[in-house]
Amino acid sequence: GQLNYFVGRDFYNSKMKYKNPPIPKDVIGFDLYINWDEPIVLCEGVFDAIAIKRNAIPMFGKTIPKKLFKKIIEKNVKKVFLMLDEDAKSDSIKITENLINFGIDVIYIAMEDGDPSDLGYERSLELIKSSREITFKELIGHKLNGKTKRYMEI
């Protein structure tokens, strides 16, 4: 195959942990390994997806690439788990709203203890298993309040 994307990672605890190339991010990471008939997990980075292991797709940032969004709709995905970093809550709400508008069940997972690559597979799996779907009422409430609140108890 051909290289379609890469990312660098700093292991010396600098402020910027990851470095993405200055190219378009309209790539679907691990596309060949995704079972589109099963629930998918959307996360920010490649290392997050690797830590989650099963049906995880890196978005290469805090927003969902158009190509990925289109494929989720075309493949008629029924359920999406959203595991974005703590600093991406407002982006999570936008993604959730867009997916709900297409009839997709969204389960937002509050990542208050770090990102999936920090937590590892076991803890990420625990969070997925203990999560619940966001209701339309909760989404509207958030938008009206203009505040981010947790949608699940951990």
Predicted feature residues:
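Phosphate-handling DNA/RNA-contact segment within nucleic-acid enzymes
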Residues: 2-79
